[in-house]
Amino acid sequence: MTYKIHLENFEGPLDLLLYFIRRDELDIYDIPIAKITKDFIGVVEEWKRLNLLIAGDFIVMASTLMLSLIHI
């Protein structure tokens, strides 16, 4: 199960969003990280059994986004 993001300027998986940010195809300041996190938490709450591998992947991607924001 892949978590997909739905934003005004992007729709797709989180790893693709990160790829576009790293290639400067999307501006990290245009990405509402708080909204992405809130939406993901809502999805996790709906899952009957949390797949920790998926949650771990999200945490890695979200952390990488935050680090990218700090280093810009």
Give the residues covered by each predicted segment:
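Conserved interaction-surface patches within small, structured recognition/assembly domains
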Residues: 1-9, 24, 29-32
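Peptidyl-prolyl cis-trans isomerase
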Residues: 14
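Glycine/small-residue-rich interface belts in oligomeric ring/scaffold proteins
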Residues: 28-67
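Conserved small/polar residues in nucleotide/adenosyl-binding loops
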Residues: 70-72
